[in-house]
Amino acid sequence: MSLFDHKITELKQMIHKKEIKISDLVDESYKRIASVDDKVQAFLQLDEERARAYAKELDEAVDGRSEHGLLFGMPIGVKDNIVTKGLRTTCSSKILENFDPIYDATVVERLQAAEAVTIGKLNMDEFAMGSSTENSAYKATKNPWNLDTVPGGSSGGSAAAVAAGEVPFSLGSDTGGSIRQPASFCGVVGLKPTYGRVSRYGLVAFASSLDQIGPITRTVEDNAFLLQAISGPDKMDSTSANVEVPDFLSSLTGDIKGLKIAVPKEYLGEGVGKEAKESVLAALKVLEDLGATWEEVSLPHSKYALATYYLLSSSEASANLARFDGIRYGYRSDNADNLIDLYKQTRSEGFGNEVKRRIMLGTFALSSGYYDAYYKKAQKVRTLIKKDFEDVFEKYDVIVGPTTPTPAFKIGEKTSDPLTMYANDILTIPVNLAGVPGISVPCGFADGLPLGLQIIGKHFDEGTVYRVAHAFEQATDHHKAKPEL
């Protein structure tokens, strides 16, 4: 049995009872990485020297002081688009190949304040653009359940590392499903918080109105621990919400009697696989047995979500990625004779194909002749999608459906057709457009690959999302399954 099979509360008790040292946890992480990461390919950089030194320092603090952080001694992996001082942050892109940040992201500072131990940086789709982690400039991460399949994306490294037992917890980011989809594919728990719940300061921007950092863990309880540690307003991020952070752990009561669940017919319609539908219906039966009720509803504008998302996110990306020009930091081409050529060559050589595709789409949507027809119209549809959610939440507590239409697909299966790749996010994208919280929890298997149940809540009501997710988790054994590597 791995130490990482224990929850945070159990590990902290073991530390304080002197049954284990924090150094043992860090050892376990690096030994497991050495054992399996050549297969899984989840990590890009390790911070072993600093992590071991910090673990030793924390070991001395067990008796040395009475107050300890919320994540005292817990090893964690961080997605490589979250800046870490003294540890390279590449966004899995050639253009940031040697970028060494001079400051920590707010979430990293909050992890440090909670006394977590950063193990290293995790692979991802380049600039978080992708659904399979095949778009990394460095390596393709594999799904620990079947090494021939993708782990999902863009936080594929974050989900795969937790599923493979390399770290017990990780941070990812979610712009259109990039935490929930890989969590579903890898059989772990992943939450996209309400937009504004967690500071984005130090998160390299893809689409600023959609991006949100969140936790990936083995259990719902651990997920709530991590969100507790990283949430809250931040003066460095004007989009962080000035709202009180509740005690998320107090929501994990197991009691969902009388709770009203909405199931959108669009989430079980055409394009959603038989196994995904069956697993959701089985999950709804579990929730019914626990005292909740459910009804079918409609989110009528969901059918426009995919097109709306790719217009808006690509438009924001084209603006955000304009800063990577070869002048201030990052890769600089040697094949240029003048400034204009330097910009062209640096960006052509430094960005991968998917990033360039989205920059071009965004630039087109924002161009003067097409702005009203594309970008402005997409913003109007986004408002309608948000209104759909608000209407449903007037009557219901949560929305439930599959996280993804199918389990993980084969590596290379969708890379030649971007539209089939994009369609994989069809059930997660509306949550980002509406800015509401959503979690994926394991709910079954298809052909030996995990499936995820998506639970969506009202703005800033992660507590109810956790309550339902935890009740379901405790009534089932799906989260206990582990891949064999």
UniProtKB/Swiss-Prot annotation:
It comes from the Bacteria. Keywords: ATP-binding, Ligase, Nucleotide-binding, Protein biosynthesis. The keyword Ligase applies. Disulfide bonds: none annotated. The active site is at K79 (charge relay system), S154 (charge relay system), S178 (acyl-ester intermediate). Heterotrimer of A, B and C subunits. This is Glutamyl-tRNA(Gln) amidotransferase subunit A.
